[in-house]
Amino acid sequence: ELAIYAMIWMTFLIAGAVLKRRHGIAVTLVSDLLPSAGRKWVIVAVDTMVLLFALMLVWLCWRWYQPLTLAQTGFDIRAFQGQTFNFIYAENTSTLGIKKFWAWLIVPWFAISLSLHGVSNLVQSLTAMRGRV
């Protein structure tokens, strides 16, 4: 189980860096046929979609973990569960015996890092479109 969680964490950690460097797997059949201006528009569109996905993932993680509600209940897990019917903080892993939310924390981390990288890439793409780079 530890090996599985380690592999999942490494995948999410490297995915953010790969997307920042624009080295992800991509199908470039259409963009290769476009002129330079068209390619720039495709890059901006892709960067926009990545950023929108990342922001949606941040929002979903916020709703999943519900940190404000947890704080409002005084970090009392039972009170939190009773108020929200969200059992994220109570479920244990099968063999390690740790709370699963610790293993799942990679998802909000990835969402935040992807959002930051998405903003950076989009700004870079828009700047390149204006011919400043």
Please identify what each model-predicted range represents:
Residues E1-V133:
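Alpha-helical transmembrane segments and membrane-interface helix-loop junctions
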